[in-house]
Amino acid sequence: MSNLSNLRHKLQNGLIASCQPVPGSAMDTPEIVAAMACAALAGGAVGLRIEGISNIQAVRRATDAPIIGIIKRDLPDSEVRITPWLEDIDALSAAGADIIAFDVTCRERPVSVADLYQRARATGCLTMADASNIDDGLLAHHLGIDFIGTTLSGYTQATVPTEPDLALVTQLAQAGCRVIAEGRYHSPALAAAAISAGAYAVTVGSAITRIEHICGWFCDAIKQCETEKLTEY
């Protein structure tokens, strides 16, 4: 089995932990990101999704587990945020990413999806498409991109849904894609549902690594209960 085939096999039917702290939060340091990554692996995660060069370098020093690397940018002339530039591809590979993920949505962009894919292939890394719909995913699949993520489903519109897009997982899987289900998988039951729907692997982020979000969910539920109690009187 080749190294790339072995890497694909490691992820199959597994959990990928996205260790991306809230920007500027108390957890937003490379050392803490690396610690979160190691804790996730100790809990059974088979891979990691890490943003930023310094974070990837820190995680790579701590583990040889598969890393999906991304760089997020806020561009003045494009809504594309995830790994938009060719130099991002080179930097991610040099930092230690095994898989390079990039936005493949049909939006105005500084570099074409095909050019990003070719540059990532040239580094020897595997590739992942962050798609928003079936058209994005199929285009990426036909280009030869190794993994198709549902990462951006619901995030290219004004209102973000509360539930994950299991229908998109099924559509892509039936088309022969290696689907990495991602986006709003906030419970073990939803992660299992993604595998049942045909996902190759499932990425979970906020529900594992963003303490602010998790605490917010609990606080909201408690407040809702308090409101319901008050309306009873």
Swiss-Prot record:
<keyword id="KW-0413">Isomerase</keyword>
<comment type="function">
    <text>Converts N-acetylmannosamine-6-phosphate (ManNAc-6-P) to N-acetylglucosamine-6-phosphate (GlcNAc-6-P).</text>
</comment>
<dbReference type="GO" id="GO:0019262">
    <property type="term" value="P:N-acetylneuraminate catabolic process"/>
</dbReference>
<comment type="similarity">
    <text>Belongs to the NanE family.</text>
</comment>
<dbReference type="GO" id="GO:0005975">
    <property type="term" value="P:carbohydrate metabolic process"/>
</dbReference>
<dbReference type="Pfam" id="PF04131">
    <property type="entry name" value="NanE"/>
</dbReference>
<protein>
    <recommendedName>
        <fullName>Putative N-acetylmannosamine-6-phosphate 2-epimerase</fullName>
        <ecNumber>5.1.3.9</ecNumber>
    </recommendedName>
</protein>
<dbReference type="InterPro" id="IPR007260">
    <property type="entry name" value="NanE"/>
</dbReference>
<dbReference type="GO" id="GO:0005829">
    <property type="term" value="C:cytosol"/>
</dbReference>
<dbReference type="InterPro" id="IPR011060">
    <property type="entry name" value="RibuloseP-bd_barrel"/>
</dbReference>
<dbReference type="GO" id="GO:0047465">
    <property type="term" value="F:N-acylglucosamine-6-phosphate 2-epimerase activity"/>
</dbReference>
<dbReference type="GO" id="GO:0006053">
    <property type="term" value="P:N-acetylmannosamine catabolic process"/>
</dbReference>
<dbReference type="InterPro" id="IPR013785">
    <property type="entry name" value="Aldolase_TIM"/>
</dbReference>
<keyword id="KW-0119">Carbohydrate metabolism</keyword>
<comment type="pathway">
    <text>Amino-sugar metabolism; N-acetylneuraminate degradation; D-fructose 6-phosphate from N-acetylneuraminate: step 3/5.</text>
</comment>
